[in-house]
Amino acid sequence: MRRLFLLLLCLALVGGCARQPSVQEPEPEPIPAVREEAEPPSFSPERYVPPPWKGSEPQQGAPIVPQPGDTAACWDMARAGDFAPDDDCSDGELLAKWLAVEGLTLSDLEDRGCTQLVLTVAREEDGVSTLTTCYVMEDNAWHAQPGLTRMAGYTGSNGIAHDRRRNTRQSPAGLWALGSAFGLASQPAGLLLPWRDITPQSDWVCDAASPYFNTWQERDDPLITQLWDLQDAEHLEDYSVTYRYACVIEYNTPPYTVPDRGCAIFLHCSDHPTSGCIGLLEEDMVRTLLWLDPRENPYILITGHEKPR
């Protein structure tokens, strides 16, 4: 009996265990499908759009005199004696020297919002050959731009003058804004300055009696062509080498035009003295153009030694 009782007890226990709900382990979460890394969103860097080309607006009303940057009243060559000869100056010393000679300070550049400066110095040997160095304001200090220092070039064939007059073949000393670029060659890739192609109709008006004096005009515009003497204009296409690449120096341009001070003063290609412009070898001219940025409000300081008389 005892054995029978134990057997029945075991069967009851086994049956009871079988009826107990089994403890289920949680189902594993599904493994997400392996996906390739998504491409980063494509974007284009903000495209820089140069400002409009300037140089065709006529003088309105009486000219503003003197033009800002005219250093005729404040320059003093004696100040050069406080510095070493140019060839012995560092690039920084060279800038300090010729700012001082022109009666200018770094504050004069700051006041103009200028953070790019082209310094052209007429050399003592002849007053006609030049050295040109480009400077940029970075970290609250002026630095010479590598690769754009002591570039050889030329002034007008009669050197520089602080009270420049027309037909003197002199370059205007002083601090002048650099404006738009133009040329007979193709626009350099990467240029930031506004650019204008020279056409067979392009004139730079030199007629002192014209309201368009010292501006670019197209002679095929019948509405205005009669407003200047076609014989008293630079027909830009005729300057096949000089104007391959050029940049307007804003000397005596509207609203400052005084006709007897002259016109058509540019930074352009040249391997010899000019009629009054500042010349650089073409390779240096192109590299300088590509460096210039209108957002930096670039200026040129034309200074140095006058041509020996």
Model-identified regions with their sequence ranges:
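Cell wall/extracellular polymer interaction/catalysis modules
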Residues: 70, 74-274, 285-309
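Positively charged n-region of N-terminal signal peptides that target proteins for export
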Residues: 1-4
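Extended catalytic/binding region for NAD+/ADP-ribose chemistry, centered on the ART fold
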Residues: 276-280
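N-terminal, intrinsically disordered, polar/charged segments of Gram-positive cell-envelope systems
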Residues: 21-92
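C-terminal motif of bacterial Sec signal peptides marking the signal peptidase cleavage site
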Residues: 15-16
